[in-house]
């Protein structure tokens, strides 16, 4: 029979197991500061890796660049003066969490660059674009194009696309003047996609949940059996003492 103490311990173990499972199903989050995934050589960018709470912020971080694990294990990876070799796929992973979604950084050399905060956005999401001049020179009379059609004449930068729709997908570029000379950036594709919903998402949680329940129940039963065994020993010991006392009296 499971005692009250064993039942409480069983529940405590179950909640602890569930907490571990829920934590392990969360992904690390990788961000850029400034937020642009396209930058010029010589520019600075800081990559930061976050967990789901402030305690994980100080935990060990694994950084992976183009499949190679970095020696850096802090929450921030700072690229002081970017080179073309810094281009590529970045992934981070906080201790106890899944790996982050990959971020693709493109480091290039040109006079004018169409910068963007993302190359893929979910419907109803948002992203920013900016027409960026070499060595941070001021860009004047900026025109933004999507699929070769002008859609924004902006003297303010950046331009924010909010509540993105599928119609916002396309190839973007910009034109503008640098020191009285007109330049055109290269083209870059930004995709707006629908969120993918897996019909069997619950299967990702039910198996570890069952394992946690079985672990907690087995532990509770083990402790309950141990307590019952101790009780039997006490009863046997008490019975022996009574038998000895009876023999001494007779």
UniProtKB/Swiss-Prot annotation:
Topological domains, Extracellular: 24-204
Tissue: Expressed in bone marrow mast cells, as well as in the pineal gland at night.
Residues in Ig-like domain copies: 28-104, 114-181
A GO term from the CC aspect: membrane raft
Disulfide bond sites: 49-92, 131-174
Segments crossing the lipid bilayer: 205-223
Glycosylation: residue positions: 58, 66, 73, 106, 152, 167
Keyword Transmembrane listed: yes
Compartments it resides in: Cell membrane
PROSITE patterns from the UniProt entry: IG_LIKE (PS50835)
One GO term (biological process): establishment of localization in cell
Alphabetized SUPFAM superfamilies for the sequence: Immunoglobulin
InterPro entries per the UniProt record, alphabetical: Ig-like_dom (IPR007110), Ig-like_dom_sf (IPR036179), Ig-like_fold (IPR013783), Ig_Fc_receptor (IPR050488), Ig_sub (IPR003599)
Presence of keyword Disulfide bond: yes
Factors inducing expression: Exhibits night/day variations with an increased expression at night in the pineal gland.
Keyword set, alphabetical order: Cell membrane, Disulfide bond, Glycoprotein, IgE-binding protein, Immunoglobulin domain, Membrane, Receptor, Repeat, Signal, Transmembrane, Transmembrane helix
Subcellular location, principal: membrane
Chain ranges on the Cytoplasmic side, renumbered to this chain: 224-250
Membrane-topology annotation of the record: Single-pass type I membrane protein
Pfam families documented for this protein: Ig_2
Signal peptide stretch: 1-23
Purpose: High-affinity receptor for immunoglobulin epsilon/IgE. Mediates IgE effector functions in myeloid cells. Upon IgE binding and antigen/allergen cross-linking initiates signaling pathways that lead to myeloid cell activation and differentiation. On mast cells, basophils and eosinophils stimulates the secretion of vasoactive amines, lipid mediators and cytokines that contribute to inflammatory response, tissue remodeling and cytotoxicity against microbes.
Protein name according to UniProt: High affinity immunoglobulin epsilon receptor subunit alpha
Taxon lineage: Eukaryota, Metazoa, Chordata, Craniata, Vertebrata
Protein encoded by which gene: Fcer1a
């Amino acid at each position: 029979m499971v005692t009250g103490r064993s039942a409480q311990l069983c529940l405590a173990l179950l909640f602890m197991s569930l907490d571990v499972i829920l934590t392990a199903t969360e992904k690390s989050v990788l961000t850029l500061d400034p937020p642009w995934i396209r930058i010029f050589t010589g520019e600075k960018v800081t990559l930061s890796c976050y967990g789901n709470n402030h305690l994980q912020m100080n935990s060990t971080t694994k950084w992976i660049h183009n499949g190679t694990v970095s020696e850096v294990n802090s929450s921030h990876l700072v690229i002081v003066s970017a080179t073309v070799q810094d281009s590529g796929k970045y992934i981070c992973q906080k201790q106890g969490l899944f790996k982050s979604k990959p971020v693709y950084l493109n480091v290039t050399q040109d006079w004018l660059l169409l910068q963007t905060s993302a190359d893929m956005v979910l419907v109803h999401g948002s992203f920013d674009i900016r027409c960026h001049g070499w060595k941070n020179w001021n860009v004047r009379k900026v025109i933004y194009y999507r699929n070769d059609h002008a859609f924004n004449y902006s003297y303010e930068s950046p331009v924010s696309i909010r509540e993105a729709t599928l119609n916002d997908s396309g190839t973007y570029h910009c034109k503008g003047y640098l020191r009285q000379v007109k330049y055109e950036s290269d083209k870059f594709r930004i995709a707006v996609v629908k969120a993918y919903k897996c019909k069997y998402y619950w299967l990702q949680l039910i198996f570890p949940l069952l394992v946690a329940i079985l672990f907690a129940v087995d532990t509770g039963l083990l402790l309950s059996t141990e307590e019952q065994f101790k009780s039997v020993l006490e009863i046997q010991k008490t019975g022996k003492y009574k038998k000895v006392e009876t023999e001494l009296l007779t």
